[in-house]
C-alpha cells in the first residue's frame, strides 16, 4: 500500500481558506514566508502542520531551530549536525508576538485573526450550531458590529431541548462551561451563539427571535440560551431582566475549539502530514527600551 502523498504549502493554504476566507481587515494570511528566492508554494512540501492560538515555547520547539541543552538556558544553537527536522507549516490565530528570527528556514506561517474569531469560536459558527442540534438551514445571522456592517458576530437557531442537555453538549465541545445565569425556564427552544455580550446585543437577539416568530410578542427570553465567551456586566444585567439563560465558555476555550476543529479537518484532508496542536499560554515578550545615545560635548 502506497504512502499518502505529502501536501504542499499552496494546498494547505487553500484548504485553510475554505474555512477562513480572507478579509480586508484581517492580519496577513501569509504571515511569515520563506525568504529563499527559489521558494515556490506550489512545490514546497509539508511534512508537519503546527496549530496554535499564539506562538509559545511549544510552538517554537516545533517550528524553530534545535537548541543546545548543555548551555545555560538552552538558547544556543547546536554546533553539531542533526537529523533534518520535518518540513513545517504553522497556523497561528494571534501571531502578533511571533519572533520571526526563531522560525526555521523554509517554514511558512499562516494566520487568521478576524475570520477565525468570526467563524471558529463562539460566533457565526455553523459547525458548532449543527453539533448543538440547531437547524442551520433556518438559522439567523447576527451581522454588523463596531462600525463594520459585514462583520458576523453570531448565529441564532431553533433547538428544542432541556437546559441541562444543552449545557452537557457545550461542556463536551469546549471542555469547560459556566451557567452564568439560569433563566426563567429550564426548557430551551432557541440558542444564540454570540461573539459579543452587551445590553444591545442581548436585546438584538431577542428582537430577531421575535421577528422570526420563535418568541411571541410580549414573551420574555426564558426559552433562549445565550452562549458566549466571557461574561460582561451589561450583558448579564440585560439577560437577567429578560429571564434569559446565559452560558460562558471562556475566551481562550472558544479559541481552542477552533484550533481543535482545524486539526481534525487537516488530518482528514492530508493524512500524509503530521498535525500537531499546541495548547499553552504565550510568554509575554519584554522588549528592551532603547537608551538614547548622548555625545560628550565638553571641551577637550
Residue ranges of model-derived segments:
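Active-site catalytic microenvironments in core metabolic enzymes, especially phosphate/sugar-handling
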Residues: 1-300
Amino acid at each position: 500500500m502506497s504512502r499518502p502523498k505529502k501536501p504542499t504549502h499552496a494546498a494547505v493554504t487553500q484548504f485553510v481558506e475554505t474555512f477562513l476566507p480572507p478579509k480586508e481587515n484581517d492580519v496577513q494570511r501569509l504571515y511569515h514566508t520563506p525568504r529563499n528566492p527559489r521558494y515556490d508554494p506550489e512545490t514546497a512540501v509539508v511534512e508537519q502542520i503546527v496549530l496554535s492560538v499564539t506562538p509559545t515555547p511549544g510552538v517554537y520547539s516545533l517550528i524553530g531551530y534545535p537548541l543546545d541543552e548543555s548551555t545555560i538556558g538552552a538558547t544556543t544553537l547546536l554546533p553539531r549536525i542533526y537529523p533534518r527536522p520535518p518540513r513545517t507549516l504553522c497556523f497561528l490565530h494571534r501571531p502578533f508576538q511571533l519572533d520571526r528570527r526563531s522560525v526555521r528556514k523554509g517554514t511558512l506561517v499562516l494566520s487568521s485573526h478576524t475570520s477565525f474569531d468570526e467563524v471558529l469560536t463562539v460566533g457565526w459558527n455553523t459547525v458548532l450550531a449543527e453539533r448543538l442540534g440547531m437547524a442551520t438551514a433556518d438559522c439567523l445571522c447576527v451581522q454588523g458590529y463596531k462600525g463594520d456592517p459585514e462583520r458576523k458576530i453570531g448565529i441564532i437557531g431553533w433547538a428544542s431541548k432541556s437546559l441541562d442537555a444543552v449545557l452537557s453538549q457545550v461542556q463536551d465541545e469546549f471542555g469547560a462551561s459556566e451557567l452564568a445565569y439560569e433563566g426563567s425556564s429550564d426548557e430551551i427552544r432557541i440558542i444564540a451563539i454570540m461573539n459579543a455580550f452587551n445590553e444591545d446585543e442581548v436585546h438584538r437577539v431577542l428582537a430577531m427571535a421575535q421577528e422570526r416568530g420563535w418568541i411571541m410578542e410580549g414573551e420574555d427570553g426564558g426559552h433562549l440560551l445565550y452562549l458566549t465567551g466571557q461574561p460582561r456586566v451589561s450583558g448579564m444585567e440585560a439577560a437577567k431582566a429578560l429571564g434569559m439563560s446565559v452560558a460562558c465558555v471562556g475566551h481562550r476555550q472558544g479559541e481552542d475549539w477552533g484550533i481543535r476543529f482545524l486539526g481534525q479537518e487537516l488530518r482528514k484532508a492530508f493524512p500524509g502530514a503530521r498535525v500537531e496542536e499546541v495548547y499553552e499560554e504565550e510568554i509575554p515578550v519584554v522588549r528592551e527600551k532603547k537608551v538614547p545615545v548622548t555625545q560628550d560635548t565638553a571641551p577637550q
